[in-house]
Amino acid sequence: MGVRRDDITNAGRMQITIEVLSSNRDYGMITGLAQQYDVSRQTIYDIANKGQQVLLAGLHPGSHGPHPSRKCISVDRDLLVRGSVVLTEAGVSQRDVCFCLEELLDSKVSLGWVNTQLAKVEERAAFANEAFQPEIEESLSGDEMYSNDHPNLLLVGNDSLYIYELSRQPDCEGETWGILLSDKSNCLQFASDAGTGLSAGVKAAEIKVHQLDWEHLLRPLWGQAARLEKQAYAVLKELEERSRLFDQTTTPGRLQQHLDQWERLNDQATEKIAVYDAFYRIARSVDDCFALIDLNSSQLQDATTCIQKLKALGEQLEAWSGRIYQKLSSNLKNWASRLFSYQAVLKQVLDPLKTRFGPQGIAALCRIWQIEANQRRRASSLPEKQQQQIPWEESLDEAIALMGEENLWKAWNEVCLALGHSWRGSMLAECVNGLLRTMLNKRKHTDQGCLELFRFLHNTRAFNQGKRAGYSPAKLAGLEVPDDPLLLLVIKEKCQSN
């Protein structure tokens, strides 16, 4: 029987191997093992040799890192369709979809087949989008973008990020927007940029509250401040370099040359620093009006005062030379009155909280919220943080004294929920436009079907991170959606073996 002796257990074979391979084994041990197991001496040697081979093979170092389990993928038509949709969702062009399927799944498909399957899926997505009819219980924001020289009009919920409308239109004039917004007049507020077509459409649809976007004002403002700061630092760097060259020079002529250049650069640096400091003060004054809560009064910003302040700052910039300053001046003067439209709606949200918890307690919590929002939004120096800590602690003590610790946390959650909404613009619609641009840029031809597919996938896919993590826009809007939304497009669920 040799090594095939079935009556010798694995533990016994292991013990035989260890004793035989030991360099300190006693004389006559092989004979003793052969008598113990009733086998020949050669069988003992064979078992030890077999055990040595197993140890050498099992203890050989393998590759480093994790070892994914081997899996056999069953490729069928449904998997190819699913792959085509997912790759399209990721912004892959139709031609590249064919390449990816061939490389990843070893399945060669034609461009015509991909286009045909996507057309069917887009048609089903349009039916699914039509079937979704959530109630509009949030504010909306709108934006327009162009692809293949055609405008696409977009309506997004500011709380859920649900796309209520995404359509290809012949133009983006006021009449077109008015028709699109005609059944959205009951929304809390509508936010947009300062486009004339959008403004005319909002007026035609009789939407009561139209809020202009603060980001369209602040983005170029702080962008110019960053450019002025960069220019000032560049001149200071040249000035430092000229000082170094001056110290290394010994000849009188060269010294005079470096001195003349240094004086010229010093005048430029002084001028650019002064320009930056003056513009930074203007930008900071405009940015202070962006806050929802006035820290001095712990109430909503006084719209009349802020409007007058913005217009006065616009008049200051009007005297500055440069196209960017004229544009900023025009925006400040023309947009100021429409940048605070949100306050009427926000006041309606805060009033019930003041009734429940008391106006002074809610005012203290609003002040705390604004202090923390300012710290998250822009970096502050240590002295500024210490200075902000004093009113934060005073407001907290006041809120505890007025409401008690138990009601404090309930009121704080309500205040954070109320003030945490998107009140001041259409930046969320532009974020969705940024996602859509990835898909449109990869397609030589776009139509309404492409937009319907993007709308469906965006509304039904759950967010991976952020405050909406684990929820899709459709679920946040009150709709029931399966965990695998592609089932709604008549695409079979993924095979369990895959």
Language model features with spans:
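Basic, short loop/linker segments at the boundary and entry of helix-turn-helix/winged-helix-like folds
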Residues: 1-18, 40-87, 135
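Major-groove recognition helix of helix-turn-helix-like DNA-binding domains
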Residues: 38-54, 107-122
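RNase H-like nuclease fold core
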Residues: 67-96, 100-208, 227, 256-261, ...
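Active-site proximal helix-loop segment of RNase H-like, two-metal nucleases, encompassing DDE(D)
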Residues: 231-247, 251-261, 418, 428-446, ...
